[in-house]
A protein has these predicted regions:
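Auxiliary alpha/beta "docking" domains used to position bulky ligands
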Residues: 1-205, 244, 253
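Iron-sulfur cluster-binding cysteine motifs and their immediate structural context
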Residues: 18, 211-234, 255-279, 340
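Non-heme iron-sulfur electron-transfer modules
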Residues: 73, 182-191, 221-249, 269-298
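Conserved hydrophobic register position within alpha-solenoid helical repeats
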Residues: 318-321, 356-357
Length: 364
C-alpha cells in the first residue's frame, strides 16, 4: 500500500475546500459512547428515539462500519463570514430561495435562521467534497473502499475530530478550533482501510470559561459538554414534532430554524469572520408558506437545510416567533398579523392551527 504524507493529505483536502484535516486510528471512543448513552438514559434526547439502542456503540466504534477500517480522516470546512460563499454557490442556496422576501419587506418583526443553514444543505455538499478527496487519494495508491460520513450516519465525528487534533470539544458541545473560523465549521470523515499515521490531539481546554453555560437563553447546557435537547432551541425548531407548548414557544424567541447563541458568546469565535444569522421578515415568510403544499415547499427550498424542518414546522416556528413579537410589543400594526394568523388557523396541519390559535391571543 502506498503511504501518503501529512502535507500531501492537507494539500489534497485544501483543493476541495476542506481547510482543516486530521487523522486518527479506528480505536473505540469509550468516553463518547458513555456520554451518548447517559444522555439517552436520562431522557435528554427528547423525542429523538433514534439516538438510543445500539447507536452510541455504533457511533463510537469506527470498525462497526467495516472490519477493514484502520484509519479515519477527519475534515472541517468553515462556513461563516467570507467562507459562506462556498456554500452559497449553488442556485438553491437559502439566500436565493428567500431573496424576494428579504428584498421586499421591512426587517421587523424578523425571525433568525442559524448560520449553518444559509447555504446549500451541507450534507450533500460536504459529502461530494469528501468523495472527491477519496477519489484523489485512491489515485495516490491508497486502497479503495473509503466511505464518507457527514452527520448522516452514526459516527462520533466531534470526538474523532478532537482525537485527530483538529480541535477540542467545548463546554457547549461544539468542536472548537484554533483556526480563524473557530467553531463555525462543518465536520466530515472518511473511513479507510489505509494505515495512516495519526495526529496528536490538541491539549487545549476551555479552562474556567463558562460563557456558553450562562449565555444559553434556555439553560439547555446543563453541565459542561452536556446538553438537554428538550431545552435546546435548535432541537425545538428543527427536530421537535407537533405543537410547541407555552414554554417552548416562548423559549425559541425569534429563532425559527436552529440557534447560534452558544457559539456567538464563545471567546474562541471572537476573531472569527462572521456576518451573523439570516434575518427573515416574519409576515411575508408566513404569507409565502401558508399556500404551499409539501411538494411545493420541497421544490422551492431545493437542497437547503430547511427541508429538514419541512413546511409545517418552519411555519409553526414562524407563527410562534410572531406571537412572541406581539407579546413583547414588537409587532407594530397588528392587522396584517391577525389576518395571517386567522388563515393559519384553518391550515391542514394541526400543529400550525394550534400554534396560530395561541399566537393570535397575544395580539388581542
Amino acid at each position: 500500500m502506498t503511504a501518503i504524507s501529512r502535507d500531501r493529505l492537507a494539500e489534497a483536502a485544501a483543493r476541495h475546500g476542506l481547510d482543516l484535516v486530521g487523522v486518527t486510528d479506528a480505536a473505540p471512543l469509550p468516553d463518547a459512547r458513555e456520554r451518548m448513552a447517559a444522555s439517552v438514559e436520562a431522557g435528554r434526547m427528547g423525542l429523538m428515539g433514534w439516538m438510543g439502542g445500539e447507536r452510541p456503540r455504533v457511533a463510537s466504534e469506527p470498525r462497526r462500519h467495516g472490519p477493514e477500517v484502520r484509519s479515519v480522516v477527519v475534515v472541517a470546512a468553515p462556513y461563516a463570514g467570507a467562507d459562506r460563499a462556498r456554500w452559497d454557490a449553488r442556485p438553491d442556496a437559502l439566500r436565493d430561495v428567500l431573496a424576494p422576501l428579504l428584498e421586499s419587506a421591512p426587517a421587523e418583526p424578523a425571525g433568525r435562521i442559524a448560520r449553518y443553514a444559509l447555504g446549500t444543505d451541507y450534507h450533500a455538499e460536504l459529502r461530494s467534497r469528501l468523495e472527491a478527496l477519496a477519489t484523489e487519494l485512491r489515485a495516490e495508491g491508497l486502497e479503495s473502499g473509503d466511505v464518507a460520513y457527514v452527520d448522516d450516519r452514526p459516527l462520533a465525528e466531534r470526538a474523532l475530530a478532537a482525537r485527530a487534533g483538529i480541535g477540542w470539544i467545548g463546554k457547549n458541545t461544539n468542536l472548537l478550533t484554533h483556526a480563524r473560523a473557530g467553531s463555525w465549521v462543518f465536520l466530515g470523515a472518511l473511513l479507510t482501510s489505509a494505515e495512516l499515521e495519526p495526529d496528536e490531539p490538541i491539549r487545549t481546554t476551555c479552562g474556567s470559561c463558562t460563557r456558553c453555560l450562562t449565555g444559553c437563553p434556555t439553560g439547555a447546557l446543563v453541565a459542561p459538554q452536556t446538553i438537554d435537547a428538550r431545552r435546546c432551541i435548535s432541537y425545538l425548531t428543527i427536530e421537535r414534532p407537533g405543537v410547541l407548548d407555552a414554554w417552548e414557544a416562548e423559549a425559541i424567541d425569534d429563532w425559527i430554524f436552529g440557534c447560534d447563541v452558544c457559539q456567538e458568546v464563545c471567546p474562541v469565535n471572537a476573531d472569527a469572520d462572521d456576518s451573523g444569522p439570516l434575518l427573515v421578515p416574519l409576515l411575508p415568510l408566513i404569507e409565502w408558506l401558508l399556500p404551499l403544499g409539501r411538494r411545493e415547499f420541497d421544490r422551492a427550498v431545493g437542497e437547503s437545510a430547511l427541508r429538514r424542518a419541512g413546511r409545517h414546522r418552519l411555519l409553526r416556528n414562524a407563527i410562534a416567533a410572531l406571537g412572541n413579537a406581539a407579546r413583547d410589543g414588537r409587532l407594530g400594526d397588528a392587522s396584517e398579523a391577525r389576518s395571517l394568523l386567522e388563515r393559519a388557523m384553518a391550515d391542514t396541519r394541526e400543529e400550525v392551527r394550534q400554534q396560530a390559535s395561541t399566537a393570535v391571543a397575544f395580539i388581542g
